[in-house]
Design a protein with these regions (language model features):
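Metallocarboxypeptidase
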Residues: 1-119
Length: 119
C-alpha cells in the first residue's frame, strides 16, 4: 500500500506532524464520511456533525464497499483518531473552476475547526 511515492509521502508527513484528525478531500456529493468499518474513534461523530453544521453537507458512515484503503480509513484504524472524507461539489467531474468560490465558502469553517482541533 505504500509503494506509490505520493502514498509514502502522505504517510511520512502524517507520522511527522501527528495530527489529531485528518481530512481527505474528494469531489462529488456534498457529504462527510466519518467512520471506518467498526472503528469509531472518540469524538468522530460529534466533529462530523459540527463540520456538517458549518458546511451544509450531510454526514454518513462510509459505505462498506468503498471503505477500504483510503487515507482516512488507514488513519482511523492506525491512530484511533477522527478522520473524514469530505466530498465537495455536485455535477460531472472534473468540477468546473466556477464552483471553487462556493466550495471554498462552504468548507472554510471545516478547515478552521479542524485547525483548532489540531492545536
Amino acid at each position: 500500500p505504500l509503494t506509490a511515492p505520493e502514498s509514502r509521502a502522505l504517510y511520512e508527513f502524517t507520522r511527522s506532524v501527528n495530527p489529531e484528525l485528518v481530512l481527505a478531500y474528494h469531489t462529488q456529493g456534498e457529504v462527510i464520511y466519518w467512520k471506518y468499518l467498526n472503528f469509531d474513534p472518540p469524538e468522530g461523530r460529534r466533529i462530523a456533525y459540527q463540520f456538517a453544521a458549518l458546511s451544509g453537507y450531510t454526514v454518513e458512515e462510509t459505505p462498506y464497499a468503498s471503505g477500504f484503503a483510503g487515507y482516512k480509513d488507514w488513519f482511523i484504524q492506525e491512530e484511533n483518531k477522527p478522520g473524514y472524507t469530505i466530498e465537495v461539489g455536485l455535477g460531472e467531474n472534473p468540477l468546473p473552476i466556477s464552483e471553487f468560490d462556493e466550495i471554498y465558502r462552504r468548507n472554510l469553517g471545516i478547515l478552521l475547526l479542524a485547525a483548532r482541533v489540531h492545536t
